[in-house]
């Protein structure tokens, strides 16, 4: 008679077995496609206590166990001012799932609570800075964040609708303020629905968002709140009812931009106008596929 698996073993096995197609394979695809991990890397996996960062930690552990490519992992938790019960939940989940976390404190919530305009943006920027600094202190050259496929889509649509910009979320980027540091997003191709399914399958409870602005959403567990991002999330859910592939289409779109069809674009902060490009001898070579499609419509 085989012994009963521990919660940690069940969670790990389900990533490789039950959710291999929807979680493990897309995770590996992103790591390979975007060259996120290199031999000799020392990566700080940043854990907020939510489902996304925790599943990222488990996936990175599994990858480290099953790859011949040597790299090191550090599991880092920044406490920006959590309530004691929220911090305890993070610690309990780390113990339950076998994640050896390092916790450090900051006063980010105290700073941002008094900010009326864009507190979430300020909080995110401050968090990023603290995480880079601590990771560098721990000898890491990369930080890994839990942004997933759905975040990429929502960010793109939100920027277009509310920011007046067609801008995506890159799978990795170099830090401007911390030389030698990079940020990677290994969940780039993993859908949020799959992460929620894994969480429910393993009967796990995570922080929804422990921010003081959004604590009322903790018990819901559906990822829906009151921010502009949540408005976009709900809009996409509605659109998926009539077009199930809408997120896939958006993702393919940002992976295959045809710049010669745009009236202008920015590259490394420099704006390039349509006349500038139109008159460039190597840029325009005639009608584009999008023009043909437009004429058909």
Task: Enumerate the predicted regions with their spans.
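The feature marks non-catalytic terminal segments
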Residues: 204-297
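Short, basic, helix/turn surface patches
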Residues: 126-138, 172-178, 233-253
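Catalytic subdomain that performs nucleotidyl-dependent activation
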Residues: 73, 150-235
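Long, contiguous hydrophobic alpha-helical segments, chiefly transmembrane helices and signal peptides
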Residues: 27, 187, 251-254
């Amino acid at each position: 008679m085989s012994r009963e698996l521990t919660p940690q073993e069940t969670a790990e096995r389900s990533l490789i077995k039950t959710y291999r197609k929807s979680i493990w394979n897309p995770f590996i695809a992103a790591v390979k496609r975007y060259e996120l991990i290199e031999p000799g890397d020392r990566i700080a996996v940043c854990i907020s206590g939510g489902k996304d960062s925790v599943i990222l930690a488990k996936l990175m552990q599994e990858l480290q166990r099953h790859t011949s490519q040597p790299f090191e992992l550090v599991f880092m938790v920044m406490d920006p001012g959590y309530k004691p019960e929220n911090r305890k939940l993070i610690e309990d989940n780390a113990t339950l799932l076998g994640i050896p976390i390092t916790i450090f404190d900051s006063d980010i919530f105290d700073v941002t609570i008094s900010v009326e305009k864009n507190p979430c943006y300020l909080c995110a920027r401050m968090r990023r800075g603290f995480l880079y600094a601590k990771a560098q202190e721990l000898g890491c050259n990369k930080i890994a964040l839990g942004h997933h496929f759905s975040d990429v889509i929502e960010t793109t649509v939100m920027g277009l609708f509310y920011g007046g910009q067609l801008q995506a979320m890159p799978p990795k980027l170099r830090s401007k303020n911390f030389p030698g540091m990079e940020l990677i997003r290994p969940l780039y191709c993993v859908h949020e629905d799959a992460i929620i399914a894994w969480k429910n399958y393993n009967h796990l409870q995570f922080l929804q968002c422990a921010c003081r602005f959004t604590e009322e959403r903790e018990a819901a567990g559906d990822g829906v709140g009151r921010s502009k991002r949540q408005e976009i999330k709900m809009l996409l859910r509605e659109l998926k009812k009539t077009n199930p592939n809408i997120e896939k289409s958006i993702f393919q779109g940002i992976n295959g931009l045809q710049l010669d069809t745009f009236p202008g674009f920015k590259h490394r902060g420099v704006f390039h106008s349509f006349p500038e490009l139109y008159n460039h001898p190597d840029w325009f070579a005639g009608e584009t596929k999008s023009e043909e499609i437009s004429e058909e419509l």
